[in-house]
Amino acid sequence: MNKAVFLDRDGTINVEKNYLYKIEDFEFTEGAVEAIKLLNQNEYKVIVISNQAGVARGYYTEEAVDKLHEYIQKQLKKYDAHIDAFYYCPHHPIHGVGKYKLQCKCRKPEDGLYKRAIKDFNIDVEKSYAVGDKLSDLIPAVDNNIKSFLVMTGYGKEEVKNIKTDMRITKNLYSFVTEII
């Protein structure tokens, strides 16, 4: 079985910018590249799980999300780092348009994408972690017995007042990695 770190994307890996999809707007959070590289070097599967409601709302396409993920991989490759997989939910139950307006099991805080990734990568949840800047990023991890960390980047400073007792707080993705390695 494999150990993994499940990462939220916006506000955790990259600077939070509402409905980010343009490559020119992408910016890693401080220490994120180094953190991902350390996770790779320590044999953690690095798996991104992200809600992409901008697709549901019609702001951008799934192809735009995929292009941004390809760009992220190219940037990480320059530093001998990589993300093992990107999973994202393009749905929204209220604000979705057309086929994207639905109540699904993949939109966090539901755990459908976590369950899929756990199965796809044969993940040992007891040796794994989740990191995000919103409680909704971490609830599905906690529901699957994955140790969870709320970062103070993105929305983390606003979310911390509602933190659950089974979640830890850390400054950013890099500080999380230094705590577990």
UniProtKB/Swiss-Prot annotation:
Q: Does the keyword rRNA processing apply?
A: no
Record-listed E.C. numbers = 3.1.3.83
Q: What class of enzyme is it?
A: hydrolase
Q: Which UniProt keywords apply?
A: Capsule biogenesis/degradation, Carbohydrate metabolism, Cytoplasm, Hydrolase, Magnesium, Metal-binding, Zinc
What SUPFAM superfamilies does this protein map onto?
A: HAD-like
Where does this polypeptide localize?
Cytoplasm
Q: Where is this site: Contributes to substrate recognition?
A: 107
Q: Where does Mg(2+) bind?
A: 8, 10, 133
- Catalytic positions? 8, 10
A GO term for molecular function:
D-glycero-beta-D-manno-heptose 1,7-bisphosphate 7-phosphatase activity
Q: Which cofactor does it need?
A: Mg(2+); Zn(2+)
Per the UniProt record, the site (Stabilizes the phosphoryl group) maps to 50, 108
Main localization of the protein described in the UniProt heading? cytoplasm
- Which is a Gene Ontology cellular component entry for this protein? cytoplasm
Binding positions for Zn(2+)? 89, 91, 104, 106
Metabolic or biological pathway, per its Swiss-Prot or TrEMBL entry: Nucleotide-sugar biosynthesis; GDP-D-glycero-alpha-D-manno-heptose biosynthesis; GDP-D-glycero-alpha-D-manno-heptose from D-glycero-alpha-D-manno-heptose 7-phosphate: step 2/3
- Catalysed transformations (reactions): D-glycero-alpha-D-manno-heptose 1,7-bisphosphate + H2O = D-glycero-alpha-D-manno-heptose 1-phosphate + phosphate
The biological processes this protein is annotated with in GO are: carbohydrate metabolic process
Q: Name one Pfam family in it.
A: PNK3P
Q: What else is known?
A: Is probably involved in the capsular polysaccharide (CPS) biosynthesis.
User: Subunit arrangement?
Assistant: Monomer.
**What family, per the record?**
Belongs to the GmhB family.
- NCBIfam families per record: GmhB_yaeD, HAD-SF-IIIA, Histidinol-ppas, PRK08942.1
Q: What name has this protein been given in UniProt?
A: D-glycero-alpha-D-manno-heptose-1,7-bisphosphate 7-phosphatase
